[in-house]
């Protein structure tokens, strides 16, 4: 009985933490634009929910660079990157969406996080295997178009 008296209050302390994570995760949903130093748009990342999955696209101009539709449960799924099939795993680590992408023998880890400002997102790109460079992309939330909800 004593173990239950100790475990229950400890469990109650985690409820607000889990609620905060859910709120922070919801902030990832939307269209995000990466800009260069002059403020010109470089690429657009769109994060959408589709049933129990996340649908993520990355476009440069009118060309779609990558498209992934995956449940953020850690299960492997397929997507496309630069016109090639890729294997992807996504999961949440607290409020951060972690994406592992395998394209051929290269493996890249991306961490999508909305920081203090809800209109700014960072994507930390970390090469695990391969010659890609580490970088942190800074993106600004794009205004919703009149037709989207």
Residue ranges of each PLM-predicted region?
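Short, solvent-exposed loop/hinge segments that bridge or flank secondary-structure elements
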Residues: 23-65, 99-100, 104-109, 131-133
């Amino acid at each position: 009985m004593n173990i239950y008296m100790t475990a229950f209050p400890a469990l109650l302390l985690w409820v607000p933490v889990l609620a905060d994570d859910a709120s922070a995760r919801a902030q990832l949903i939307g269209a995000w634009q990466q800009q260069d130093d002059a403020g010109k748009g470089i690429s657009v990342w769109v994060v959408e929910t589709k049933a129990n999955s996340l649908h993520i696209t990355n476009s440069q101009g009118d060309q779609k660079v990558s498209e992934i539709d995956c449940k953020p449960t850690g299960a492997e799924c397929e997507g496309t990157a630069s016109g090639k099939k890729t294997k992807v795993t996504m999961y949440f680590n607290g409020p951060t969406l972690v994406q592992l992408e395998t394209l051929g023998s290269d493996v890249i880890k991306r961490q999508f996080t909305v920081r203090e400002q809800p209109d700014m997102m960072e994507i930390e790109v970390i090469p695990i295997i391969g010659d890609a460079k580490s970088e942190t992309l800074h993106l600004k939330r794009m205004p919703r178009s009149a037709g989207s909800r």
